[in-house]
Amino acid sequence: MGHRAIAAVVVIGFSLLVSGCAVTQVQVDTLAEFHQSRPKSILIVPVVNRSIDIKASTSVLTTLPRQLGEKGYYVFPVNTVKALLEFEGLSSPQEVHNVPPAELASLFHADSILYVTIHSWTSKYIIVSTTTEVDIEYRLVAADGALLWADREKLKHSPDSHENGTVLSTLLLAVVESAIERADPNYLPLTRQANAKVFWNVNQPFPPGPYAPGYFEYYQDKP
Amino acid sequence: MRASLSILLLAGLLSGCATQGLYDWGDYEADLFDYYHQPGDKERVIENLVQHLDRMAAKGRKPAPGLLAEAGTYYLLEGDAEAAVDFYRQEAAAWPESRPMMATLITNLEAN
């Protein structure tokens, strides 16, 4: 085995490693399925929460309708959906995620279903500030089960720092704010930030829905 | 002076842009979050949403998708099926996509 062969093995091994990493990060490279499916409505089902923070899932659930409604989609009312699913005997989010998409879609006559999983949500208290780190996965699936779009977002959030004021008052403010953040982390700003990064990402633009002003132009050149 | 005026103007323009979207969502996000975690706030949350929907109707603006149905569900979970059906009908009238789901809810409620 010459140098070249060894180099080839190394390259292959390396690319396997790299692709191995890529697999854990769910990504859709092409929007072809999305464009073909052209969903008009999105059913956001209850959020699966793998963290121990019970408010993490409700903060994600309550901030998604606006995000997607403003993209031009009809978004099924999340609390009404949750109530109806509970009447149907599906009381845990994991149970809902396990139902075949076609079944869920037909129950609501939805064009697509958004599944969100919170992989982690941790708040760390370090001297005078609390940092919350989250890891959230989003998957949009068509009524027939085809994956239309996916993203996974990891981000950190800390309360705003205070640049004005004396060192002492800044320190005091930070301590007070950190205590508040620890008692009740600032859920909604954090999840809004995560959602915005996902749905308004310029590198992976989420297509507009039928109520968005740019909808017809967007689909004009799509097959 | 002129600089500060233009900064004010710019800030005004920017904040104007920030609030302009397809819909006015009122306090929907924060209120629903409160509804889940502060059971004592339920009455206030329901009242606030109904007032928001009244304001939208008075302005002739279409409410954001789902908000009429959410008001219906708040009433339903308080035991007021009649008010729930009324809001579900309004959601169905405003949003064709919601009609099958609203029909299911209305049929179930009227059967009981």
Task: Enumerate the predicted regions with their spans.
Chain B
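Bacterial Sec signal peptide processing site at the extreme N-terminus
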Residues: 11-34
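Residue signature of alpha-solenoid helical repeat architecture, marking inter-repeat boundaries
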Residues: 23, 62-63
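The tetratricopeptide repeat
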Residues: 66-67, 102
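Structural register within alpha-helical repeat arrays
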Residues: 70-71
